[in-house]
């Protein structure tokens, strides 16, 4: 006889009644499930499907919980390892002998280190972490050379925490000096160029103070009325134009990040995208000689490529047909009115159709065969399918040269610019910035008679500048090949060789705003001065000339200050912070286009610089473009 024997043997439904021979041999959960199934079967309808779906959801939920637990365990183990490494670093006794006071040292690269009596390592004890470069944040700071440490030990000052923890140098021959002007010595630094310059400047200011122009003063006055920012940026003394070191570093940090797009899938900087566009544009120049095979090689060709590009742009503007963007901006993007973020999020990373049709560089590249077709226009379905299958446009010069330059960095994952159009847009904007730099920096010679009073000693002190100049230097000569009086002006060529190239060698992810924060500040100021608003792109009044209301416009809107608040405020979410950053980036693009579209860009830049930033001549302009500020000394 079976263990479960029914009292009534009926074929309709099997219910087990109490019986002396019935023995229950199933777990409680199985019995509960049988009861639920019976109840569902009796109710009918959609109850059975709901129960089955609940079971499926519970099974997937258990699997997800197990995966989550595994990931949390892995993360905790990794965190424990990193904490152990940090404890080991903190426990290490890496004491350095005392050296000279933290100062950015000056020494030309042609001189041996031992020949300079003040050779040492520059440190920035009060520089915020946010101002360090991304390369330093990943690989660690540059180690101090052994002879520099020995010289530091002979002079007698304490080293900074950054210098103590820098035990391994960066791989390769990475320069730690930059040259800005031909008539000044090179600036030698440790890891953070601008942070150490600012720190040295404020350390030397014992009997004097600095003013940085009316733009910085208006920013200080606007923040002074807000108790939180007054405390964060150490604001005081509203009766003078001086600002605190914290506020200056906050502004410079915001300007450096204008073209640094904060997304995980951004694989190219705007400088690398511009190099790809330039090498495809100038492919005819490589006939008869070895073409460039790296971004560094393209950057070295900037003095030859940009003049040719400027001439072609001038001819294209002279033969312009069709409407021009508001304010006669030939470098404008026709974004949709509801565009809030820089990165296109739909349509296969394509912008709104018509975005590039009023940009002079796109028209020029289309005529020269750099771009096979304008992005978003007249795309044939068969061609689009073929492009997606092959990964590049048929006979696409830009894709071929991009792969040549970037295959060593990205392998096979080199983006196609006409499909991932954020790279095309960033490259075009960077090209516009480089064109503006070439036009304004080579407008006059640094050896001409000066009208300004700023000198490099105002930044680093007279002791650091003395004895560290170039051959001849400001005392009455020029370096061979860069003569201002005996040859054509070559300020831009000097920057390319001794500033842009060395910085890219240190950090291949550097962007144009990190190289020239002063250029970003000028462009944003010009955009705000015009009254343009990225949230009202179709407003015709927003593209006007702006009259002379420079100060009135600046007092009403300051996207740089908005981004500073978004960076340091916990009230901003990630999307809101990204929106504020992109608004600043849109202002930067619009301002560059306006400055380049005027007949004399040098005159417009000079007007903005002299009225807002203490810039009076080409020598001061070069330092302002590189540093993002220009101090004017005032005795206490």
Curated annotation (Swiss-Prot):
Keywords: Capsid protein, Host nucleus, Host-virus interaction, Viral genome packaging, Viral penetration into host nucleus, Viral release from host cell, Virion, Virus entry into host cell. GO terms for biological process: symbiont entry into host cell; viral genome packaging; viral penetration into host nucleus. It is found in: Virion; Host nucleus. Residues 97-125 are annotated as: Disordered. Residues 1-48 are annotated as: Interaction with major capsid protein/MCP. InterPro entries: Herpes_UL25 (IPR002493). It comes from the Viruses. It holds the Pfam family Herpes_UL25. One of its GO terms (cellular component) is viral tegument. Its main location: virion. HAMAP family: HSV_CVC2. Belongs to the herpesviridae CVC2 protein family. Capsid vertex-specific component that plays a role during viral DNA encapsidation, assuring correct genome cleavage and presumably stabilizing capsids that contain full-length viral genomes. Participates in the interaction between the capsid and the tegument through interaction with the large tegument protein/LTP. Heterodimerizes with CVC1. Interacts with major capsid protein/MCP and triplex capsid protein 1/TRX1 at the pentamer vertices. Interacts with the large tegument protein/LTP. This is Capsid vertex component 2. It comes from Human cytomegalovirus (strain Merlin). The gene is CVC2.
């Amino acid at each position: 006889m079976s263990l479960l024997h029914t009292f009534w043997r009926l074929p309709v439904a099997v219910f087990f009644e109490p019986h002396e021979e019935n023995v229950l041999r199933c777990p409680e959960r199985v019995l509960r499930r049988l009861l639920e199934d019976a109840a569902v079967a009796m109710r009918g309808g959609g109850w059975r499907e709901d129960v089955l779906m609940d079971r499926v959801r519970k099974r997937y939920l258990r699997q997800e919980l197990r995966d989550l637990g595994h990931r949390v365990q892995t993360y905790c183990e990794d965190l424990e390892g990193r904490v152990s490494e940090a404890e080991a670093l903190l426990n290490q006794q890496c004491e350095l002998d005392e050296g000279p006071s933290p100062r950015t040292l000056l020494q030309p690269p042609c001189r041996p280190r031992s020949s300079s009596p003040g050779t040492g390592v520059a440190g920035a004890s009060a520089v915020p972490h946010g101002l360090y470069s991304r390369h330093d944040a990943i690989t660690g700071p540059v180690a101090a050379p052994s002879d520099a440490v020995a010289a530091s030990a002979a002079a007698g000052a304490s080293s900074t925490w950054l210098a103590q923890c820098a035990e391994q140098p960066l791989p390769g021959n990475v320069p730690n000096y930059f040259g800005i002007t031909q008539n000044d010595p090179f600036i030698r630094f440790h890891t953070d160029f601008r942070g150490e310059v600012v720190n040295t400047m404020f350390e030397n200011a014992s009997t004097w103070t600095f003013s940085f122009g009316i733009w910085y003063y208006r920013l200080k006055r606007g923040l002074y009325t807000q108790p939180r920012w007054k405390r964060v940026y150490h604001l005081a003394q509203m009766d003078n134009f001086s600002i605190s070191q914290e506020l200056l570093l906050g502004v410079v940090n915001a300007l450096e990040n204008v073209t640094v797009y904060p997304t995980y899938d951004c694989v190219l900087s705007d400088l690398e995208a511009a190099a790809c566009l330039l090498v495809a544009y100038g492919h005819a120049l490589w006939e008869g000689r070895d073409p460039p095979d790296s971004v560094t090689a393209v950057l070295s060709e900037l003095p030859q490529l940009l003049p040719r590009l400027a001439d072609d742009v001038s001819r294209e503007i002279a033969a312009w047909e069709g409407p021009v963007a508001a304010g006669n901006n030939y470098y404008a993007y026709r974004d949709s009115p509801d565009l809030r973020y820089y990165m296109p999020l739909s349509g296969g990373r394509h912008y709104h159709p018509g975005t590039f049709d009023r940009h002079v560089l796109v028209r020029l590249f289309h005529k020269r065969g750099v771009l096979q077709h304008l992005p978003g226009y007249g795309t044939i379905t068969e061609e689009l399918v073929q492009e997606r299958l092959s990964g590049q446009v048929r006979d696409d010069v830009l894709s071929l040269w991009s792969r040549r330059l970037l295959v060593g960095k990205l392998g096979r994952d080199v983006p196609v610019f006409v499909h991932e159009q954020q790279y095309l847009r960033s490259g075009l904007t960077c090209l516009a910035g480089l064109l503006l730099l070439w036009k304004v920096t080579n407008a006059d010679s640094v050896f001409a008679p000066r009208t300004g009073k700023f000198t490099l000693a105002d930044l680093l002190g007279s002791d650091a500048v003395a004895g560290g100049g170039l051959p001849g230097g400001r005392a009455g000569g020029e370096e061979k090949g860069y003569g201002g009086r005996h040859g054509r002006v070559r300020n831009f060529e000097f920057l390319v060789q001794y500033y842009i190239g060395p910085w890219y060698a240190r950090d291949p992810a550097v962007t144009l705003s990190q190289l020239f924060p002063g250029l970003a500040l000028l462009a944003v100021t010009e955009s705000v001065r015009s009254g343009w608003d990225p949230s009202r792109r179709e407003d015709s009044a927003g593209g006007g000339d702006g009259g002379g209301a420079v100060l009135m416009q600046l007092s009403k809107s300051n996207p740089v200050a908005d981004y500073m608040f978004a960076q340091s405020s916990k009230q901003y979410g990630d999307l809101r912070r990204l929106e504020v950053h992109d608004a600043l980036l849109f202002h930067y693009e619009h301002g560059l286009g306006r400055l380049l579209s005027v007949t004399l860009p040098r005159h417009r830049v000079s007007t903005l610089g002299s009225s807002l930033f203490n810039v009076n001549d080409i020598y001061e302009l070069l330092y302002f473009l590189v540093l993002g500020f220009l101090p004017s000394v005032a005795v206490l």
